[in-house]
Swiss-Prot record:
Protein's name according to its UniProt entry: NADH-quinone oxidoreductase subunit K
Naturally occurring in which organism (per UniProt): Azotobacter vinelandii (strain DJ / ATCC BAA-1303)
Superkingdom as given in the UniProt entry: Bacteria
Chemical reaction(s) catalysed: a quinone + NADH + 5 H(+)(in) = a quinol + NAD(+) + 4 H(+)(out)
A GO MF term: NADH:ubiquinone reductase (non-electrogenic) activity
Keyword presence, Signal: no
Main location: membrane
Keyword tags: Cell inner membrane, Cell membrane, Membrane, NAD, Quinone, Translocase, Transmembrane, Transmembrane helix, Transport, Ubiquinone
Amino acid sequence: MNAIPMEHGLALSGVLFSLGLIGLMVRRNILFVLMSLEVMMNAAALAFVVAGSRWAQADGQIMFILVITLAAAEASIGLAILLQLHRRFHTLDIDAASEMRG
């Protein structure tokens, strides 16, 4: 079975990261911002796996596990903020977050 060339994997990772970055900059809904962040983190994880497989090292897979763990923590904190924002202001607009003061 032939492996996917490293250039193709890194190109896919770059495209996914760019799409996530565009979504992060364009959207004002906090749910879409969180989804864009997840796409960007998965693109970075894919780049680690592709680079690790190129040199037959397990480092890429270890970094993948680290990135996925970080993404899970980010998602849980982000969803908690999203729920509080929706409960308090009845909106998911990210500009309303500037009014949240504790």
